[in-house]
Amino acid sequence: MELNNIPKYSIRGLNIWGFRDMAHFLDHIFQREQVKTGTMVAINAEKVLTAEEDTALSTLLSDAEYLYADGISIVRAIRRKYPDTEVSRVAGADLWEAIMERAGKEGTPIFLVGGKPEILKQTESKLRAQWNVNIVGSQNGYFTPEERNAVFERIHASGAVIVTVAMGSPKQEIFMRDCRKIHSNALYMGVGGTYDVFTGHVKRAPKAWQNLGLEWLYRLLSQPSRIRRQFKLLKFIGYYYSGRL
């Protein structure tokens, strides 16, 4: 696959990019010392189902340039609907770290948004120490609706080329959409709880679980309160086996 000819696969009306691996995704984003612009959103089965019930979220996802297969359920759905495809799972937390490492090497200006104040500070410190990331500004997730435009203006004034937003869905998608109206020439990435994972405050599943596609089960065992959310995924399983993907 050429870097500018990446296939897209339709799953329940969402067009998901088919990157064959992490390196392929990174090479597409960082081309000729320039970073692609647009909005990146991680897609899993839960987000697909939520978008079917939430018109506003569906519109946000449709408007985003990069929907990528974060969940193993999405990868398997694509492979079932489109046999012989090379698409692979690209976990959002891993992708964010890879982008930060690459940005550090190239001196790309980064602006961080979201998270608790102390978590954000730890994230900044670790990024600078680990990869010499050029962080040109940050804003924790505790700001009022009245302060949003001021945050947008700060991001614009910083000259950030990559903006990562950790506010949870759909708040982060809404934030990225609105911020792009002020600062359009940047790559935006919604990262959920990635800062918490990066700083060690939340544990990810062991690599063996991740490689088996069982990270969702690990999270469920660690957080039994997620059981209702997992029951919701039975609907996606129904789509999978009935050929309604």
UniProtKB/Swiss-Prot annotation:
Pathway participation: Bacterial outer membrane biogenesis; enterobacterial common antigen biosynthesis
Name this polypeptide is given: UDP-N-acetyl-D-mannosaminuronic acid transferase
Family listed: Belongs to the glycosyltransferase 26 family.
Alphabetical UniProt keywords: Glycosyltransferase, Transferase
A GO BP annotation: enterobacterial common antigen biosynthetic process
Keyword Transferase: yes
Lineage per the UniProt record: Bacteria, Pseudomonadati, Pseudomonadota, Gammaproteobacteria, Enterobacterales
Task of the protein: Catalyzes the synthesis of Und-PP-GlcNAc-ManNAcA (Lipid II), the second lipid-linked intermediate involved in enterobacterial common antigen (ECA) synthesis.
UniProt source species: Photorhabdus laumondii subsp. laumondii (strain DSM 15139 / CIP 105565 / TT01)
Reactions catalysed: UDP-N-acetyl-alpha-D-mannosaminouronate + N-acetyl-alpha-D-glucosaminyl-di-trans,octa-cis-undecaprenyl diphosphate = beta-D-ManNAcA-(1->4)-alpha-D-GlcNAc-di-trans,octa-cis-undecaprenyl diphosphate + UDP + H(+)
Disulfide bond annotation, renumbered to this chain: none
GO molecular function: lipopolysaccharide N-acetylmannosaminouronosyltransferase activity
Keyword Transferase applies: yes
Family annotation (HAMAP family): WecG_RffM (MF_01001)
